[in-house]
Amino acid sequence: MRWGSVILAALFEIGWVMGLKHADSALEWICTAAAVVMSFYILVKAGEKLPVGTVYAVFTGLGTAGTVVCEIALFNEPANIAKLALIGVLLCGVIGLKLVTNEEKGEAS
C-alpha cells in the first residue's frame, strides 16, 4: 500500500494547511507543526519506493483539492461551479498520473 502512504501524507498536509489559517491556541499550533513533520516524513518515505515526481504531484494535488473541499465544507468558503470543476480536473490529472506510473521507482511506462 505504497500509494496509501502518499494519501496519508496528503491528509496531514491538509491538516497543517488548515492549521496555518485557523490555529488560535498553543495546542493547535503544536498540532499544526506535528502535521507538517508527519506530512513530509511520510512523503519522503514514499519517495524512496515510488517515482518521486509522481509522488510529489499526487501529494500536492490531493492536498490542494482536499484543502479547498475542507474550506468549503467546514468554513463556509464560497463554492462555485468553476472552482469545483477545476478541482475535478486536478483530481483527474492526479488519478491519471497514478494510473500510468509503475509501482517501482525508476520504472517507466
Curated annotation (Swiss-Prot):
Location in or out of the cell: Cell membrane
Keywords: Cell membrane, Ion transport, Membrane, Transmembrane, Transmembrane helix, Transport
GO annotation, biological process: monoatomic ion transport
Topology with respect to the bilayer: Multi-pass membrane protein
GO MF entries: transmembrane transporter activity
Superkingdom: Bacteria
Listed InterPro entries: Small_drug/metabolite_transptr, Small_multidrug_res
Chain segments annotated as transmembrane: 3-23, 26-46, 55-75, 81-101
Cellular compartments per GO CC: plasma membrane
Family to which the UniProt record says this protein belongs: Belongs to the drug/metabolite transporter (DMT) superfamily. Small multidrug resistance (SMR) (TC 2.A.7.1) family. YkkC/YkkD subfamily.
Quaternary state and interactors: The efflux pump is composed of GdnC and GdnD.
Reported function: Probably involved in guanidinium transport.
Protein name listed in UniProt: Probable guanidinium efflux system subunit GdnC
Source species: Bacillus licheniformis (strain ATCC 14580 / DSM 13 / JCM 2505 / CCUG 7422 / NBRC 12200 / NCIMB 9375 / NCTC 10341 / NRRL NRS-1264 / Gibson 46)
